[in-house]
Amino acid sequence: MRSVPLVAPRRLELVEAPLPEGPRAGELLLRMRAVGLCGSDLHWWAEGRIHSTPARYPQILGHEPVGEVLAVGEGVTGFHVGEVVSVEPSLTCGHCEFCIAGRHNLCIHARFQGGPEAPGFLRDYAVIPAHNADRVPAGLSVQEATLIEPLAVWVHVYELEPVRLGDTVAVLGAGPIGLLGIAMAKQAGAEMVLACDRVPHRLDLARRMGADGTALMGERDFRELVMDLTRGRGVDIVYDAAGAPETISQGLRCLRPGGALVLIGIPEPLEFAVDLHAALARELRIQTVRRSNHKGAQAAALLAAGRIPTSLITHRMPLEQAQEGFEMLHSYADGVGKLVFDFDLKG
């Protein structure tokens, strides 16, 4: 089968790999149909690490997969050959205190498919635990269904720090995660959603996803826009999807007293300064987010109902062009929003 491992920083190679063994009891064998490219994939590719965790070469990236069921392992119910499924990429133990409490995303034994611990899905076939699969609703294309995994992160975010009717919201960073966050906030009843990014075409996408106001970083001060449009009050919630030290600091300054800063993006530097006095003086809440928590079914339902636009998907590429796809997204070329590797396309 085809596989595209990361073999060095900024270098993917198309190779032939053996088929996976299985499925064993409780597992599904999938033929991959499409995989979305995520910002965390770019961190592995560009920097060779996430936080202090180094890549382990060869490492197969890709954790926003959609596949077709080819075989069903013994004891599996609810799935049939030929069905199309999305995959929750975190392999959890099911018996630690956090799994037992229903907080699977905090599992102390978790292995993440696409990280150094377990291969991701930039390959033709994969075997997964059946309980990590979510059926793709009728009417969603395989390309659109790659949004289930990142949207599931937002469903989990809303368990922790939801938008309430009439809230004002700022989204920092208008990459794919930020764009989904804009749409989620509008669906949740936000009165106003403001967004910023340093890439002009991403702000066009932000407006298409529902942003009421945008600012290009480096051209207009985002806090000035926020204070102008909220009459000096500040927003109720800031969702930071950029993970840059400057956006995190800016997010704190954009909040009203008692507001909440939610950190979703992955910071590139291992250490950086944040003015916590700004948070203490106004009793701000700071909430971090780790992945999702088996929220794929809810995310799929939102997409199937048409409540979240899928127009952020701007590019499809065959698996053979994975290296070019990573380079495109890293350089923000060609107006790219969300890029999907479509396994049915020929390279």
Where do the language-model regions lie?
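C-terminal hydrophobic helical "lid"/dimerization subdomain
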Residues: 1-3, 249-252, 293, 297-347
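N-terminal glycine-rich cofactor-binding segment
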Residues: 3-22, 39-71, 86, 107-119
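Glycine-rich beta-strand-centered segment in the early N-terminal region that forms part
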Residues: 20-35, 50-97, 137-139
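Cysteine-cluster motifs in flexible loop/terminal segments that predominantly coordinate metals
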Residues: 38, 89-134, 138
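Mid-domain Rossmann-like dinucleotide-binding core that forms the NAD(H)/NADP(H) cofactor-binding site
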Residues: 131, 140-220, 224-225, 315
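Glycine-rich cofactor phosphate-binding loops and adjacent beta1-alpha1 units
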Residues: 161, 204, 208-285, 344-347
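Rossmann-fold dehydrogenase core element
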Residues: 260, 273-312
